[in-house]
UniProtKB/Swiss-Prot annotation:
Name used for this protein in its record: Dehydrogenase pkfF
Residues at the catalytic site: H547 (proton acceptor)
Keywords: FAD, Flavoprotein, Glycoprotein, Oxidoreductase, Signal
Protein origin, superkingdom: Eukaryota
Amino acid sequence: MRHTALLPLVSSFIVPALAQIPGQTTVNATVNQGRFGNATYDYVIVGGGTSGLAIAARLAEDPSLSVAVIEAGGYYELDGTVASIIPGLAAGANVGTDATEYSTVDWNFQAQPLTSANDRSLRYNRGKTLGGSSARHYMVYQRGTRGSYDQWAELTGDESWGWDSVFPYFQRSVNVTPANMTGRFPNTTVTYDPSGFNKAGGPLHVTWPNYGSPWSTWIEQGLEAIGILPDTDFNTGTLNGSSWAPITINPLSQKRDSSETSFLQQSLKTTNLTVYLHTMALKIGFDGTTASSVDVRSPVGRFTLSARREIIVSAGALQSPQLLMVSGIGPRETLERHGIPVVKELAGVGQKMWEHPFFGITHQVNLVTATELAINQQALLQALNQYKSQQGPLTSAGFGVLGWEKLPNSTLSDSTNEALATFPSDWPTIEYLSIDGYLNGWHSAADQATGNGQQWGTIAVALVAPLSRGNVTISSSDMDDPPVFDLGFLTHPADREIAVAAMRRIRQAFAAISEITIGDEVVPGADVSTDEELLDFIRESIVPVYHVAGTCAMGREDDPEAVVDPQARVIGVNNLRVVDASIFPTLPPGHPQSTCYMVAEKIADLIKKGN
């Protein structure tokens, strides 16, 4: 039985109430809207997403500079549903991986069939809105390990990308508010290291929701029973243990905080930043090998935006390489196949794609989880009433506790250990996620109403040291044609072995909290027991965490696979940078929004200093 009629109820009930919530950002619908027609700016930024709005806002702080942002979408608060705003409805906002799923604030891309996962083709979330994917994800804010960024320094030949050097840029973007324990249960106490943050940081808010789910408290116990200790910190360079996850929400309103509600809204109050809404970047124009303009299409027609100084591409890890390729930068064979004149041959464009896949185990449980909101209208009404006072389960994004573990070498084969040796020693192998509901592949939000009134609890794992790589390419010279991308899940044998080992670890954690489970394991089921059976289940249920990165990788200029240099400048051309997750040399363990902001802060600082 599935209950799918509750979201309209949410909209009709909560929309009038949003205006009453303190700390709400008023949407500035004019956003210093650029006039549709040819224009020239000092900096033209393609993409108003996580990194794009951050770097735009920082550059616009200089009153002598003119800065324009090209964004294909609009405001998610206006174009989307309230599920984009309320953390507890994020699952409904994100929709699922089925091809029939659709969001008005998303590109709704479809990945190529997964050759090592039963040829499943998954719909893939990418924000088509101001804020980009910071308006779409589950808001987790945590940083990678010290070693992961020190490895960036090694790969780029630039020590300024090491942990000690990038740490201040992490701090610059955010301000942290300690958890308000008034509405949280006593056993949901938050522990963190304040030294990870700076009181002068901002404008992005980081805090903890005013609700900690009972399910997550049990996950914390289960993880501790298998050696994953609680009360660790996620933002000072170590990921080893579990804790309540900090998320990017406004501490007063308990609403999502994105690059739009933070960086853009602050910038609109103090600068002359110009934003072109619902405007599609079609092609970068060059004078020889110097980037000079961007051809765009708006609701009223096509025109050209020229840049006196630089064009900065921040279109995300799928569309930044796509835009480079349709503009003449990329693998020669690809460009020539589509009749695109070669401006600069760069074989690495679109290659070395990283992503974190995840899957998990679900049990029926004897406590109330977020499942109740999907199957019980009265419970949802009660939660909505609580949310009007910034309390209750809708302040939380459907999870609470995250955990990290580096699997012992003794549990893995020599070949897998050898493959994992390419990662720094402090890099965890897997991340545990406490999901307050049902998971068996992420088909749609209606998954949460599976069954006949049961309460579900899931422990999921993400492979955060993946060895499989994907790629993205183009099908034509037209940006209107979606990018063609292969996530590459499970193509490396080490990932398959680690995935099976992770499933067995989840079962050990569940065994330690058996007093709250009802009956046998539901997903995948107790009869799925051999390595082969577990791997078959993983192939059929593995889904992305939407952390795609690395497709315009940063590296040394003599690295044949590098696309940008350590200053994010596209190699071999002038006045063109890429600033988003596509330039990550590796994808640090965990959730990348913190690193997207850090990269934007660092490159903005370099530009301001004349580099």
